[in-house]
Design a protein with these regions (language model features):
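Terminal, regulation- and interaction-focused segments at domain boundaries
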Residues: 1-32
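Short, flexible, solvent-exposed loop/turn segments with mixed acidic/basic and small polar residues
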Residues: 1-4, 64-71
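Short beta-strand-to-loop capping motifs
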Residues: 11-15, 78-83
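Short, conserved charged micro-motifs
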Residues: 18-22, 84-90
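A common structural junction motif
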Residues: 28-31, 95-103
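Short, hydrophobic/aromatic-rich segments at coil-to-beta transitions
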Residues: 39-45
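Short connector loops at helix/strand junctions that flank enzyme active sites
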Residues: 42, 51, 71-75
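A short, structured beta-strand/loop element
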Residues: 50-68
Length: 104
């Protein structure tokens, strides 16, 4: 275990809670999906990862409207504890890849 201070990373995402959890659990399956424990009506979870831990907290789900387009909106906070910057970068890359949307 490392003596690294916890690192908080916040993200503003256009996604609802159900879709977030469905995709999130696939990031490092089965490592995450086999041990994740939800708290606060599925708005938080915590799990061990590579000798440290990661906590995820979701804001209340809201709506973002851009002209006629209506999108779900959720603020996501990831808290990394006892992980090196290399490990955090690795998880962040997996996170971004999992939630990447096809664009054109």
């Amino acid at each position: 275990m490392s003596d690294n201070a916890p690192v908080l990373i916040s993200k503003d995402m256009s996604i609802g809670h159900a879709d977030f959890w469905r995709l999130f659990l696939k990031i490092d399956a089965p490592v995450i999906s086999d041990q994740v424990s939800y708290q606060a009506a599925m708005r938080r979870c915590h799990f061990d990862w590579q000798g440290g831990s990661i906590s995820v907290e979701l804001s209340a789900e809201s709506i973002r409207q851009i002209a006629a387009l209506v999108l779900p909106q959720t603020d996501v906070t990831l808290r990394y504890a006892d992980l090196s910057s290399t490990q955090i970068d690795e998880f962040e890359k997996k996170f971004e890849r999992q939630f990447q949307r096809a664009g054109g």
